[in-house]
Amino acid sequence: MIWVLLAQYQIPISSISVEPKGGERSCRERERDALLSFKASIEDPSDVLSSWQTGQDCCRWRGVVCSNRTGHVVKLDLHNNFTIFNYDYNTDMINYKFRMLGGEIGPSLLAIEHLNYLNLSYNDFGHKRIPEFIGSFKNLKYLDLSYAGFGGSIPPQLGNLTKLLHLDLSFNSLESVDYVSWLPRLSSLKYLDMSEVNLSTTVDGVHALNMLPASLRVLYLFDCNLNATFSSLPLYSSNLTSLVRLNLGYNYFHGPIPDGLLRNMTSLKELGLQSNDLIGDIAELMKRLPPKIEELDLSTNNLTGSLPIRLEHMTSLRYLYLYNNSLNGHIPSGIGKLTNLRGLDLSFNNLLGIISENHFASLTRLEELYLSNNNNLTMVVDPNWIPPFKLKYVDLSSCNLGPHFPTWIRSQTDIIDLIMSNTGIVDRLPDWFWNVISSVEYLDLSLNQISRVLPSTLEFLSAAYEINLNSNQFHGGVPKLMMSLQVLDLSNNSITGTVPLSMCNQVQSLEILDLSHNRLSGQLPQCLTSRKSFRADHGDLTLIGSKLSIVSFSNNSLSGEFPLFFRSCQYLNFLDLSYNDFYGSLPIWIGKRLPQLAFLLLRSNMFSGYIPIQLAKLDYLHVLDLAHNNLSGTIAPSLVNFTAMTTVSSYGSYYVPDFISMLVVTKGQALEYYTNTIISLMSSLDLSSNCLTGKIPEEIGGLATLKNLNLSGNRLTGDIPETIGGLWSLESLDLSNNELYGEIPPTLSNLTFLSYLNLSYNNLSGVIPSGQQLQTFDDPSIYKGNNDLCGPPISKNCSGDGTTLNYPLKYEDGNEMSSFYLSMGLRFAVGLWVVIGPLLFKRTWSAAYFLFIDNIFDKIYVFMVLNWARLIANIRKK
């Protein structure tokens, strides 16, 4: 692969004089001893260097190449060759890490004086610095330390490698404060990749690009934190006229692309400026591109305008990536003349109009087509059209393809990824479909109205790792699954029957399972393996499906006790069994066996018994919804001690994909949350509509990051605890329909984010506290059914009835109280004048402002009169 890359980047292979092993000369003893000493300092868990044995010819060792002529070691290639990941990512990652070399790179290698090729990539050297002695290999022409876990500063001694042609330091944790001092000395360098090397600390680092060797043909500075205006780049005045490939993506460049940027780079074939903050017109930019550009990536910027008609003359283009900009207008049909085009990504723009056969007329080599999220883009082709291409990757989501299922897909037998979500298809899935996509790995037909009985088995899709058919009209039973599957979403369909026992043996790789909103019935399979497979001493049940992290069976008719199936799912972070017919008690093992659980949704079932206090051990629990069950007992103080609800930082390491939804009843309405970002910010405790008794524990005030608290519809008694004022993040509080008594605590006014409150139908008494956020609640119904409450916003007056009044601010005597109200009045007047004064000079502002004042004046007046009455009553009493 290295030789292919060198040829592609026009680096003469002959210039790197590595000779194949197999010659008659054996290696030099001094060099063999040096290699053995190197091996002794290296960590090699998978025994990659097992062939390196004392007394044997080192020229025949793995990764070692000697010169046929001299016997000197000239090449050392110890890169981790396990770099191809298939369907089981977790298993592959374990194998990949197991094959990594680590430890110390000892200076014994200096004995190999004739080394001209060194590759240590894809290993892990534990963030150690790159050894300075590497700069002593005077004959080195090829150095690859990418993805090797190095850290710290790049040693300037690398500047001594004056014969170096290829240098790759990418994707480590490196930084370079003074790369200006050593890079220009590499006068023969043709290939330089310093991607993800932090260059932000380099003094005048952007202008230092002018000092790069003129010999460079490939320059990759991807994600180097250069952070500058693009106009400050000196590339247009530099001597990098031989550049063939240039990537400056993810560098926080901003502003327009200057006219002369690419003036001298007439040989440029690849240009990557993706994920910056560039502005400008796409048509003007394309005028400046070199005539033989082959790969252009301007994605994730702020480019505007329409694609130019002259695009059809860029006949060398192989890959065009313009996604996630603000492009508009029509896609020119001349794009169909780009005969070399292999990849086209125009997704996430504002493109519109019709896509026809003409747009693809001569695209015989096209393999990647991404047009998603251009909501006004419609594809209209003849039903009998057979495309000239064989696509592998297709994403047309949120384009208009319907109402009929696109028949041209029938010819695309090489498809690996097929995404046609939300495309307006209202049709029956064709008979030929499953045969055509037999090689698919990722299938998404969600958010359409596609109908058909699901096949009894999907095992023939042996390569598939994700299938998403949610929100369609599929019916039939749950099909048998393939062993490779990681994500299955059949939610919002009409799937019937039971969850088959066969799933237990066919979900070994499954991580996300969503069968919610269907018509499933019966009990979930327990999926226990033989008793020999788990250890009774520790109770560690080994269950098939232990990789599951997200499971939703909500809105079905499933029954039975809490499924024992989940007992071994130690990575589970999202579990939704709500709106079913599950019964029995909640198992205490939830708190121990599911340590990663962040969302537990069991609403609207028939669970009974106590709420196990072991749930408090779930450190990452953000949402607990046990509403509408038959749970009884008290709310134990230890139960309201969820770590993730007490501190801002306890979010855990979980991911919920966008297509997984979560229903939360908050602010008096049921809200459905979809995206991972919103779900991860939600914190909710809902125990409503059960049979809970006793007091609300004072410890509940420690849940400082809780946003939604609903304890309504129980039989709770006692006071509302004063500590409730500690819920400073609370937005919704519902304590209605209980048997709470006593006064409403004035600390409730501390909840400055509170936007929904319901205390109705309790036995609360006394004055409704005012101040801060509570003054915004002017709907008397939130206090309805508490006959002994008085004060705004209800009509019952608190003054003159002989009742002992309690209110938020209490003082020793009337003089202090009078001073307080006098001070408050003066502050109010001064503050009001500071606001109103400027308004007197701006007529439109003053009109709007005083109209607002008129609306609230009555409320302020009533508030002041009421407090004055309280003052007089208190003075008389004393």
Language model features: what each stretch is:
Residues M1-K878:
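Plant-biased, solvent-exposed loop and capping regions
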